Design a protein with these regions (language model features):
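DnaQ-like (DEDDh/DEDDy) 3′-5′ exonuclease domain used for proofreading
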Residues: 1-130, 135-188
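Short, solvent-exposed loop/turn and secondary-structure capping segments
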Residues: 118, 138-148, 216-217, 243, ...
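Flexible, glycine-/basic-rich loop-and-beta segments that form/coincide
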Residues: 240-311
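Secondary-structure transition/capping motifs at alpha-helix termini
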Residues: 122-126, 194-201, 221-231, 431-437, ...
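Conserved S-adenosyl-L-methionine
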Residues: 111, 145-155, 183, 210-212, ...
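Conserved Class I SAM-dependent methyltransferase catalytic core
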Residues: 162, 169-232, 467
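Short, surface-exposed recognition loops and adjoining beta-strand edges that mediate ligand/DNA contacts
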Residues: 47, 227-245
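Segments forming glycine/polar-rich beta-alpha architectures that bind adenosine-containing cofactors
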Residues: 117, 121-122, 130, 273, ...
Length: 480
């Protein structure tokens, strides 16, 4: 039997519900002073009457206007970022490896406090920060700055129920659905993170639809809108089956510079999934099917999002996949016969001259860099191999699948539900056009960033270092 409520409904809350249906842009958050304490801030829904008046008026309502982004607790977040602490980092030499020589750090503790402590030694020195903060879905938001709370305390904090178990306002989800706490948590940390970046440093932040808008606004304020470099879309095969309408298969990666004017240009990176495409191409070539059949298979393969950027590399030989390009050049006067290797007849030429001298062309033919047709009626083309053209500017849409990383983590019995793929982090780190700098990750989780940095160094001989920061969470008893 349900517990009886010996009081009338909260008509104000019901009226706010009704207004929210008609004018959702008029609903905001405000501090609930009645149910708040110095230790616990409780928020409630409220109506922005200035906006409501405007919604009900055909004319512009008098009053000062200002473009601003604010929330309950914003000023407190700024104060928190600037507040000094009386703590220090304590070395754990017995748990460390190569303590006297390592240049890498793994720090356990609240990342807000750690960021403050790092100001002394790393102020203005870091070239790159990568973070994968909680996406504010409720269960993953553990970074409230008094962060250990029971569900009952959490419900009380956001005003879901009062001490008599009466619902204070309509909100059937967790505190993560209210953006104020998340914005406060991120804002203070972004302020401190910016201090640590060098003038030519950059920060990358993974996020999804829940907070991409608020994160972009926070970063615009902390770093300046002019310093936002890009918002990457990260596409994946892994659908998140948590939506009633659309199967979400993408996330975002926000990239911001400390100062875009001094950030090094020429962000040439290795094309994503190039190793995989080269491997598949070689397997097709070695399968015994004809060259034309291999070409047809690759034409079909590049229609998949994972291989979109290789849509021209649909031929393959003993060197790997290549694209066929024009051998002529506008205004060229280099005209001579190029003989077909089978028919021994001069190949067809266009209205323009060859792009190479006769000596250079002979060398290209000898080195098997020329693609001939079935006979001399087809113009020869130049082979441009993928392995020689693997680096290019990063594209704003990237394809990475986190399923393989999740499976690897589970196989290793690590208790992290949504780890980022190592190749994905390697790609991010490789964007920066140097290989001797320190990467900070203050939401390090399973330390995928550290893994990626070490693996990338092993591949290209770089000397990148890392600083990982993670809350000292309890491990699952079944993990090793």
């Amino acid at each position: 039997m349900d517990k009886m409520k010996f009081e009338s409904p909260d008509m104000t809350a019901l009226n706010i519900d009704r207004i929210a249906v008609l004018f959702p842009n008029c609903v905001t958050e405000m501090l609930d002073e009645e149910h708040s304490t110095p230790e616990k801030k409780v928020y409630k829904r409220a109506i922005n009457f200035e906006i409501l008046k405007q919604m009900l008026s055909p004319d512009v309502v008098d009053g000062d206007e200002a473009y601003e982004f604010t929330w309950v607790g914003k000023k407190a977040a700024i104060v928190e970022a600037n507040k000094p602490i009386r703590k220090t980092l304590r070395p754990c030499i017995e748990e460390s490896k190569n303590w006297d020589t390592t240049e890498n750090l793994y720090i356990e503790g609240d990342n807000l406090e750690v960021l403050k402590l790092l100001q002394e030694s790393y102020l203005g020195k870091l070239k790159m920060i990568y973070i994968d903060p909680p996406y504010n879905k409720g269960s993953d938001f553990i970074y409230a700055d008094d962060f250990m709370r029971s569900q009952e305390e959490e419900n009380a904090q956001i005003g879901m129920y009062d001490e008599d178990e009466n619902r204070l306002f309509k909100n059937t989800d967790t505190n993560g659905r209210f953006h104020s706490d998340w914005c406060s948590m991120m804002y203070s940390r972004l302020m401190l993170a910016r201090n640590l970046l060098a003038d030519d440093g950059v920060i990358f932040i993974s996020i999804d639809d829940n907070e991409i808008e608020n994160l972009t606004r926070c970063c615009s304020e902390v770093f300046g809108t002019a310093n936002i470099i890009a918002t990457f879309v990260i596409a994946s095969n892994s659908a998140k089956n948590n939506s009633k309408f659309v199967s979400v298969t993408h996330e975002y990666l926000l990239c911001i510079a400390k100062n875009k004017e001094t950030t090094p240009p020429d962000w040439a990176v290795k094309k994503t999934n190039s190793n995989s495409f080269i491997k598949v191409s070689q397997q097709l070539l070695n399968s015994g099917i004809s060259t034309q059949e291999v070409h047809s298979e690759l034409l079909a393969l590049v229609k998949y999002p994972k291989y979109y950027e290789f849509d021209h590399y649909t031929y393959v030989d003993h060197r790997g996949p290549f694209r066929a390009s024009d051998l002529t050049a506008p205004g060229s006067k280099a005209r001579y016969d190029v003989f077909h290797p089978v028919t021994n007849k001069p190949c067809k030429t266009g209205t323009r001259g060859w792009a190479y001298s006769e000596v250079e062309m002979k060398k290209l033919i000898e080195d098997d860099y020329i693609l001939f047709g079935e006979d001399e009626t087809v113009m020869p083309q130049l082979k441009n191999y993928l392995f020689e053209n693997e680096r290019s500017l990063p594209k704003s849409v990237l394809f990475f699948d986190s399923q393989s990383s999740t499976k690897w983590m589970k196989a290793q019995r690590f208790g992290f539900d949504f780890p980022k793929a190592i190749d994905y982090i390697k790609y991010i780190v490789s964007m920066y056009p140097h290989n001797n700098f320190t990467v900070l990750d203050f939401f390090s989780g399973s330390a995928t960033t550290a893994h990626a940095v070490m693996q990338l160094n092993a591949e290209d001989g770089g000397h990148r270092k890392f600083i990982m920061v993670q809350l000292p969470e309890k491990c699952d008893e079944s993990s090793e």
